[in-house]
Amino acid sequence: MARLNVKPTRMELSNLKNRLKTATRGHKLLKDKRDELMRRFVDLIRENNELRQTIEKELAANMKEFVLAKASENSLMVEELFAVPVHEVTLWIDIENIMSVNVPKFHVQSNTAREQEQGEFAYSYLSSNSEMDNTIQKTKELLEKLLRLAEVEKTCQLMADDIEKTRRRVNGLEYSIIPQLEETIHYIELKLEEAERASLVRIMKITS
């Protein structure tokens, strides 16, 4: 490891020791941050996988039920049933800070006033069968899970980027900056000791 190109003086030695102290403290903080990010990242990956499996399973089941329900209805009637959707939702995004990483938090709110005014479904119960109603209701209930999945996946992406940046900074301090400072400090201390011994020898020669 090449040492820093500085003059071997006591002032430089003091400055380098302060830099080493700061670098060592920063290294510990960054390692703690990296480890905590990794812990949360692993938890989110696990949640993401479980949530995705659940959603895919429920979507497949809902699609199958929808196809069966649609088969028992007139195709023109089905088109009319969904021609004018009345279910409205409002989506907004907040930002949450996790270990200095800004991640999205999705919130959704249904327009309950309009639903109460026009009915829970975009069609009349009299115009459709119960299987169709049940399928649409299940699909609506999946919205919250879908938003959570999008939230988790984006958070994982942002965390992965920050983990990589933090890892590079930790490695830079651990394998480059800190060893370089330590080697330079050791070099200056040796030079100062040599200068002190040489000065002592000169004094002894003068007094003898």
From Swiss-Prot:
| Alphabetized GO MF terms | ATP binding; proton-transporting ATP synthase activity, rotational mechanism; proton-transporting ATPase activity, rotational mechanism
Q: Does the keyword Plastid apply?
A: no
What keywords are assigned to this protein?
ATP synthesis, Hydrogen ion transport, Ion transport, Transport
Q: Which InterPro entries match?
A: V_ATPase_D
The record's annotation in Pfam families points to: ATP-synt_D (PF01813)
A GO biological process of this protein is: proton motive force-driven plasma membrane ATP synthesis
For this chain, the family text in UniProt reads: Belongs to the V-ATPase D subunit family.
**Protein name per the record:** V-type ATP synthase subunit D
What organism does this protein naturally occur in?
Streptococcus pyogenes serotype M49 (strain NZ131)
